[in-house]
């Protein structure tokens, strides 16, 4: 079974609150519309561009995406 990006992202919750990655993880957790089962870059980035007001910059997502690819 393919691991979703959301499940990967959750490992960063509850960290140092000033960390933008932690804020992203907490925001995605609270976002009921986040595509939780997806491991598709286009779907996730499109969603975040339109709905990810809790994400400071798409660069944060892109960096985490690269880590996700290397770790899964």
Swiss-Prot record:
<dbReference type="InterPro" id="IPR036806">
    <property type="entry name" value="YozE_SAM-like_sf"/>
</dbReference>
<dbReference type="Pfam" id="PF06855">
    <property type="entry name" value="YozE_SAM_like"/>
</dbReference>
<dbReference type="InterPro" id="IPR023089">
    <property type="entry name" value="YozE_SAM-like"/>
</dbReference>
<dbReference type="InterPro" id="IPR010673">
    <property type="entry name" value="UPF0346"/>
</dbReference>
<comment type="similarity">
    <text>Belongs to the UPF0346 family.</text>
</comment>
<protein>
    <recommendedName>
        <fullName>UPF0346 protein GTNG_1419</fullName>
    </recommendedName>
</protein>
């Amino acid at each position: 079974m393919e691991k979703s990006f959301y499940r990967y992202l959750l490992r960063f919750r509850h960290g140092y609150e000033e960390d933008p990655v932690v804020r992203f993880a907490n925001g995605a957790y609270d976002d009921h519309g986040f595509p939780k089962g997806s491991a598709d870059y286009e779907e996730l980035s499109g969603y975040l561009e339109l709905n990810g007001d809790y994400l400071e910059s798409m660069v944060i997502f892109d960096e985490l995406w690269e880590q996700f690819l290397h770790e899964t």
